[in-house]
Structure formats: structure tokens, C-alpha cells
Amino acid sequence: MEKLLNTPMPSFDKETPGSPFWTKLAFFLCRRTAANQFRTIEYSGMENIPTDRGSLCAAWHTNGLIDPLGIMLAHPKEFVMGGRHDLVTRPILSFWTRRLAVQPVVRKAELLRGGCSEEEATNLNGRSLLTLATGIASGFGCVLFPEGTSHDLSHMMRFRTGPMRTVLAAAAIAKGSGRKCPVMQPVGLHFRVRHHYRTDMWVEFGEPHYLPEDDIPQDLIEAVQKREWVEPPGDLVRSLRDLSLIHI
């Protein structure tokens, strides 16, 4: 838990939330990896990405670390990143995630296996989601997967609410600071044969969902301005989750 709490925090007053040098190097290597892994890569709906505000990209999750790779390489924004907690504790991988300021999240599945208390997980997750929300409100991009885990099923798994709660908190931060409200951006990820080397990938950016700014409660706005995590209203979270189910 101490290692998770000591995860480097992103900075939103420069070009990249993480280290500029390591971020540029990581994305260079990712582009070479994508060019080697895929025979063709196609993007559509780029005109649907608003460039005057932050956005949270949400997609189904069938191809592990390849899924965020396809989204981030095409998106015009720099990204603030979050993911399951072991991304920042595993050897080799943690070297990169810590330099990119990836924020760890402890899922319920990991909590049941032990390693930390529910209170510690709640505090860590609240800090991470609030940090991601601050980055989105500051105009950066972010990608989170509502299913919560990568899988090889032919249908979507039950959606978690973390991405919806995060983007609503980002909207509260933006509204309280006079910035433009961020959007939730549905993304379609398509692979000709998902597990094949040199297959084809198609990334489809759907029309963004503009959040209901007038429905964001004042107590949520005041809490996030104090850097305190408060859960957004359940009805707003569920309506946004149901809307995402239709479009992802």
C-alpha cells in the first residue's frame, strides 16, 4: 500500500501530466509497436473529438494494453492515465507507469484477495479518481474502461461506474473553476482477429456526450474545489452509465 500511496502525482500546468521526456519516448515506442503489431490501423470520427475541453474516452476492453494504445495514439490531447493498481507495482512496467504518472485504482476483485483494508482502498481510489477528474477538467484526455477488466467474451461485461463518477467529478471541477465542461467520448475498438499478429485495427470515435451541467449539485462542486472526493448523485451516475451502454 505504501508503494501505491507514493505513486508520482501528475502535473497539469505543463504539456504532459507525466514526465515530458519519458512521455514522448513512451509514445514513440508505442507508435513503433503499433506499426509492428498491426497490418493496418484506421481511425474514423476524429471530427467528433472536441479540442476545446477535456474528454474521457470509454470503450469495451477485449485486448489488454492494446486497447488504450489505439485510443491514445490517435487522440489530439495528452492523457492523464489511471489503471489497476498492479500497473504501478510490477517490475519493468512500473518503470514506465510511474514516469507517466499513472494513478492506481484498487478494484473490488483485488480487495477481496487481501493486501489492504477497505478503508485504505477507498482513500486511494478517491485520491486517484479525483486526480484523474482534475486532469480531465484541465483539458487533458483520459481513457477508462467501464467493464473494469480485459476479457475475450463476444459481449460486454457488466459496467462499473468508476468512469462515470470520474467524468461527473471533472464536470464539477470545471464548472467551479469557470472552464468548459468535459465530455464523455464513446469509442469503438474493432480488430479483424483480436489475438493475431499483423491483424487490422479500426478505432471509431463516436459523438461525444455533453454532461448535464445544470444537474451537478453545488455540494459536489464545493467538495472537489477543496480536493475532497464526494460521490456524485447516483441517478446521474446510472443515467450516464446506461447511456454509455447504448453507444459503446
Where are these predicted regions, by residue range?
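Eukaryotic N-terminal low-complexity, Ser/Thr- and Lys/Arg-rich leader segments
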Residues: 1-20, 24
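Soluble catalytic domains of membrane acyltransferases
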Residues: 16-217, 223, 235
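N-terminal assembly/attachment segments of tailed bacteriophage virion structural proteins
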Residues: 230-234
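A conserved active-site cap/scaffold subdomain adjacent to cofactor or substrate pockets
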Residues: 239-243
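Conserved small/polar residues in nucleotide/adenosyl-binding loops
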Residues: 246-248
